[in-house]
A protein has these predicted regions:
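Catalytic Walker B motif of ABC-type/P-loop ATPase nucleotide-binding domains
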Residues: 161-164
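Short coil-to-helix segment of the ABC ATPase nucleotide-binding domain corresponding to the Q-loop/switch region
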Residues: 96-103
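A short, proline-enriched helix->beta-strand linker immediately N-terminal to the Walker B motif
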Residues: 155-159
Length: 238
């Protein structure tokens, strides 16, 4: 079944050229894929369209059987509850605790304090940070801060998880650890799309790759896997 479908989607800002031009692709439910391309290729714009931070100039976007191009403004918050987003710079609140950062989407959505606390602990447990709820993000390493960002993105159990350069500021070892987390969410049925410049990481992972070139989808291809189907990133030690 299809989770995401773009049909002849274009996005133009002002009188300039198209940031995205005639984009067509599908992502299956539970699929893991990468979105890559040069700086300015349109990766962030494509993700913003899926989050309804932007609207397309032309074409149709379907996410979880909902047509985003005709969605009313009042429906947007409900759509965003289905989507988790991870940013390169974490976008954490450094004057709040880790618990407060992760709980923020639940508070906005109106969850009770008891249910929010349960979900926050479960999300932190899933990224290996359970027991650190009372600490401040500034006390954490870059990799740990990114884990907090991932916990916040999945705390409301989204069907679709988007990440924009989530390993851009991390060394290769930490990058693989973060990718390992994304794979775990994909293995329980979450559709994952990761925008990244890290071609070496993409090639090691061996998943489908969507390649943007000056706003056009250059190709959609599967990499030959360099790992067995049940081998996780970071399992090689020799």
């Amino acid at each position: 079944m299809t989770m995401v479908r773009f049909e002849r989607v274009s996005k133009r800002y002002g009188a300039g050229k198209d940031a995205l031009s005639n984009i067509n692709f599908e992502l299956a439910r539970g699929e893991f894929a990468f979105l890559t391309g040069h700086s300015g290729a349109g990766k962030s714009t494509l993700l913003k369209l899926m989050m309804l931070m932007e609207r397309p100039t032309r074409g149709k976007i379907i996410v979880d059987d909902q047509d985003l191009t005709t969605m009313r403004l009042g429906q947007v918050p409900y759509h965003r509850r289905k989507v988790g987003v991870v940013f390169q710079n974490h976008q954490l609140l450094f004057d709040r605790t880790i618990f407060d950062n992760v709980a923020l989407p639940l508070q906005i959505a109106g969850y009770t304090p008891t249910e929010a606390a349960r979900r926050v602990r479960a999300a932190l447990d899933s990224v290996g940070l359970l027991g650190m709820e009372g600490r401040n993000p500034i006390e954490l390493s870059g990799g740990e801060q990114q884990r907090v960002g991932i916990a916040r993105a999945v705390v409301h159990k989204p069907a679709l998880l988007l990440a924009d350069e989530p390993t851009g500021n991390l060394d290769p070892e930490l990058s693989e650890e973060i990718m390992n987390l994304f794979l775990r969410f994909q293995q329980v049925g979450v559709t994952v799309l990761i925008a990244t410049h890290d071609i070496a990481l993409i090639e090691r992972m061996g998943h489908r790759r969507l390649i943007l070139d000056h706003g056009k989808l250059h190709c959609s291809e599967f990499q030959s896997r360099k790992r067995s189907a049940n081998e996780m990133p970071g399992d090689d030690h020799g």
